[in-house]
Swiss-Prot record:
Reactions it catalyzes: fluoride(in) = fluoride(out)
Protein name (record): Fluoride-specific ion channel FluC 1
Predominant place of localization: membrane
Keywords: Cell membrane, Ion channel, Ion transport, Membrane, Metal-binding, Sodium, Transmembrane, Transmembrane helix, Transport
Organism: Lactobacillus acidophilus (strain ATCC 700396 / NCK56 / N2 / NCFM)
Amino acid sequence: MSTKTGNYISIAIFAFFGGIARAWLNSSFGFYGTFWGNIIGCFLLAFFTYLFMEFKDVRQWLTVGLGTGFVGAFTTFSTFNLDVLKNIQANVPITALIYFLSSIIFGFCFAYLGMNAGKQVGNLLRKED
């Protein structure tokens, strides 16, 4: 099997699980499920990216599977935008603005935390080798 084919299969498998996790969040927490899914996704993508940067021999199928597959299916930019528009149309523009700004601010903060956590875990794992 070619590397390209393996990457596509990995993305599909990980996306399946990311989609299930997101569906569970949305069914369990509704509107807040989308918010927290996106925030957690910001953390996870940064975490995996910086963790894998600490190692030279990480398989590409794993990096694209977790990043593009799992996190890509777990997060949703389109639903985020739709939720903002729904709040505007429901004449609650303050709620829309708070949701929009908190998503951007918390997303950035959690990505920053994920970056630092990924670097630290990577350093710890390298020291154990």
